[in-house]
Amino acid sequence: LGLGYISAYLQNWFAEAINVRLMVFPEDLDHAVAGDLKPDIVGFGTFTWNRNLTDYYSKKIKDAINPLILYGGQELPIGSDQQTRFMMERPFVDFCVPAEGEIGMRNIVERYLNSSKDIESMKIKAIEGVIFLDSNSDLVSENNEIEPVNLNDLPSPILTGVFDDFFQKGLTPMLQFVRGCPNKCAYCRQGSVESKKIRRYPSKISLEAILYLEKRVENIGKHLSKLAEDHGCKPVGEC
């Protein structure tokens, strides 16, 4: 769901300057590398449950076509020492975007386009909301807790059709009505001060997304959606 929001946001922001393609299945990545797609930037949502698979494909893709590789997700390390260790263990990863990804990803794409797509020249100075290692393997980090995207300005990946192909393949639709978490779990990035700010998506957009799913998902025999909130993921019927 997070990658869907980022995809819709970037495509809306940069319009025809870029072409964003969302992939979920490993075989799609294999086809992209082996075929004619040859992406300039490949981003992964990395979590505990998919870390080994993500590392495997990141290295494979980097060795094959050498695109810009970046990691994002709420389970990236928080402290600078842990972030440095994480990136040094993964030399095939160029950049990481901690916490919410829309603004950091936008800054990476802007820097990439303005640097003639040269990855090393992108690292001459810090990128807001992004971490990376410089030529001396020192961590470069600037304002990781940047002001998050305004949810009123965020296109819905459901209403823009980003997920349509995945519904046809039987994946469970997911919805999100709020971002942020009031809990203070020390092990979780959502326990940070910034993440405690509860922000709601516009009610009109949320309702339109539900109606959109009702029309499309019912026809393929799916009757269950999940609510993916920062404080937990549960079936919509339980909410």
Stretch-by-stretch model annotation:
Residues 9, 13, 18-145:
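Glycine-rich beta-alpha loop elements in corrinoid/cobalamin-binding modules
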Residues 129, 139-140, 151, 172-174:
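A residue-level signal for beta-strand positions that form part of recognition/binding surfaces
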Residues 8, 59, 84-85, 152, ...:
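Active-site phosphate/pyrophosphate- and oxyanion-stabilizing loops and adjacent acidic/basic residues
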Residues 1-3:
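Glycine- and acidic-residue-enriched helix-capping/strand-helix junction motifs
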Residues 143-149, 154:
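Conserved phosphate-binding/catalytic region of the ribokinase-like
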Residues 5, 91, 100-103, 201, ...:
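A general alpha-helical scaffold signature found inside nucleotide-binding enzyme cores
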Residues 152-239:
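Radical SAM [4Fe-4S] cluster-binding motif and immediate context
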